[in-house]
Amino acid sequence: MIDGDGFRPNVGIVICNRDGQVLWAKRYGQHSWQFPQGGVDDGETPEQAMYRELYEEIGLKPEDVTIMATSRNWLKYRLPKRLVRWDSSPVCIGQKQKWFLLQLDPGRESRIQFGCHGHPEFDDWRWVSFWYPVRQVVSFKREVYRRVMKEFAPLAMPVPAVQVNKKDGRRNRPR
């Protein structure tokens, strides 16, 4: 399904843990890493597509995660001209994405597996610092990643504990 402007509706998934780290997945047989993502099928809501992609790509089910946020807007990126399939109809020039911030529920990390539905999209994963993906994702996705991570940061980043200064009793945030 491609819209009238040539963009394919898609969902992106940021999975975080309680330490504010995010799941970073390595594309199958490649050296590139990204967040899980995938197309929205006809008749499917973005949330339904997210849960389907979550299972197909990462092996997680709805009971393994908690939805913390959904992006306010659809975020678009254009594909580099060399990646556009000009002979297809209609021509897809990029993706428009609705993003979801999920928290992996405690004790569910062992359920992460690849290839639950056909050919695996990924062959490795790791926890990385929250902002790491913005610098590391393929260049044409960086602006979308920057925007979505900025939107999700207040919810995903752990709030530092307040410490009381023993000398004068004032409250300080750790540096």
Swiss-Prot record:
Its EC number is 3.6.1.-. One of its GO terms (cellular component) is cytoplasm. PROSITE patterns: NUDIX, NUDIX_BOX. The keyword Nucleotide-binding does not apply. One of its GO terms (molecular function) is mRNA 5'-diphosphatase activity. It holds the Pfam family NUDIX. Its cofactor is a divalent metal cation. A motif (Nudix box) lies at residues 38-59. The keyword Phosphoprotein does not apply. GO terms for biological process: mRNA catabolic process. Residues 6-150 form the Nudix hydrolase domain. Keywords: Hydrolase. InterPro entries: Nudix_hydrolase (IPR020476), NUDIX_hydrolase-like_dom_sf (IPR015797), NUDIX_hydrolase_CS (IPR020084), NUDIX_hydrolase_dom (IPR000086), RppH (IPR022927). It comes from the Bacteria. Belongs to the Nudix hydrolase family. RppH subfamily. Accelerates the degradation of transcripts by removing pyrophosphate from the 5'-end of triphosphorylated RNA, leading to a more labile monophosphorylated state that can stimulate subsequent ribonuclease cleavage. PANTHER family: M7GPPPN-MRNA HYDROLASE. NCBIfam families: PRK00714.1-1, PRK00714.1-4, PRK00714.1-5. This is RNA pyrophosphohydrolase.
